[in-house]
Amino acid sequence: MSWLNVKHAMDLSPWIRIPLMWPEPGLEDVEEAQTPEAWARYFAEGLWEDFAPEKPEPGEVDLLTDILLMYALRAPAAFPDFEVFLHLPHPREIPLPAYVDLVEIEEGEDRETALRDLTHADASYAVEPPIVEDFHSPHLGAGLRVLRYYQDEDSNEVHVGLRYAWRYEKGTEAADVLIILADPDAGRILKALDDVDEFARTVRISADEEADTWTSS
């Protein structure tokens, strides 16, 4: 059985992965992976160190710690069981969550229909026709990238959604791969688009025998 491999996305500097649980299996000896509080503090301090000689103002490390902790506790609930990454190119910016997972293929559903459904390419609720583009991954092949504007049901604000999807088929195994982002700030999504494209191209499906590499490095 193959598995969703997001390990290579962890090497991209604007991205921080939120562990799936605390502590995460295989990371029991990693101090920052034991609790969300330890994780948030570790990355808050590390991000500011990465931006030296720019110095944080008094309280900014604590503020970023609190922000990261909030995302660690709340973001995974939006799409349970999805891998969650935060795009954070600067410690003074607000994180942008990205969700990644495998989606079971419904029986008889063809590739094009499935990918358009997953990406909301034909969403009737969009305030204007979604921008649908082919998107190639070196690991997953041809897929779709869809950018859409829609009205949030709770706030009535116009939000921006960005989704990517591919179909993976190898032997008897098949699944769809889905990436989801959304934000009320269109500029935040558009500014991050190149980074998100790069992130999307690192996602892959790996064989069982490669699973140990997840915990060994």
Role assignments for model-derived ranges:
Residues 1-160, 168-176, 181-217:
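N-terminal targeting sequences that direct proteins away from the cytosol to non-cytosolic compartments
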